[in-house]
Amino acid sequence: MAILEATNIHKSYGTKLNKQEVLKGIDIRVEKGEFVSIMGASGSGKTTLLNVLSSIDKLSNGSIKIEGSEMTRLKEKELAQFRKKHLGFIFQEYNLLDTLTVKENILLPLSITKIPRKAADEKFKQVATELGIYEIKDKYPNEISGGQKQRASAARAFIHEPSIIFADEPTGALDSKSASDLLGKLQQLNEKLRATIVMVTHDPVAASYCSRVIFIKDGQIYTQLHKGDESRQTFFKDIMKTQGVLGGVQNDH
């Protein structure tokens, strides 16, 4: 079942006289339970694509359906409600509230639902245990490491069981061990909960944890790689080869 269907996605910036087309007719379909990475050189449009797919930014033309709902037809208020219920986000900057504990931060998405306290606590325990942060639940963000902050941010994205999670360079601010810890946990949650994840990354190691990698070049899909039954190491080598053909991938914000 397709969770995300994007058809003929166009995104332009500027005026008619000085228009820059960043996305040029992209089609993407993401099935339930897929862990998909979007890669591309700096300026290729990968971050713009994630922002448009996740409704952070408006598209110029095309169709985006999530769980069958046409995102482009939703009014601002409806879109905000849809986003709260169906979408989860993991950003590079963690975005945790300093005045709340780790547990309180993670439970934020449930505070807008009518879920009973006991059920919320059970959900919290499950996801926090999976991500290895249950023991630090009563600490504040300034008392924990960057890797722990990002795992708390990931737990907050998973807690309300969204239809799809969008991750923008989630390992960008982490050292290699913290990054591999986070990616391993995301992979586990993807497999255990059949969570659907779309992640933008410039890092081939991060992309190798995914089941499919979409390469963007000049605002269009250049090619795709499927992991299939390959080992992560073999998939990593395939990603590196494709990246080499693309001419290297720099960090892109």
Curated annotation (Swiss-Prot):
Keywords: Antibiotic resistance, ATP-binding, Nucleotide-binding, Transport. One of its GO terms (molecular function) is ATP hydrolysis activity. Residues 4-243 form the ABC transporter domain. ATP binds at G40, A41, S42, G43, S44, G45, K46, T47. The keyword Nucleotide-binding applies. CDD domains: ABC_MJ0796_LolCDE_FtsE. SMART domains: AAA (SM00382). One of its GO terms (biological process) is response to antibiotic. Transmembrane segments: none annotated. Belongs to the ABC transporter superfamily. Part of the ABC transporter complex BceAB (TC 3.A.1.123.5) involved in bacitracin export. Responsible for energy coupling to the transport system. The complex is composed of two ATP-binding proteins (BceA) and two transmembrane proteins (BceB). This is Bacitracin export ATP-binding protein BceA. It comes from Halalkalibacterium halodurans (strain ATCC BAA-125 / DSM 18197 / FERM 7344 / JCM 9153 / C-125) (Bacillus halodurans). The gene is bceA.
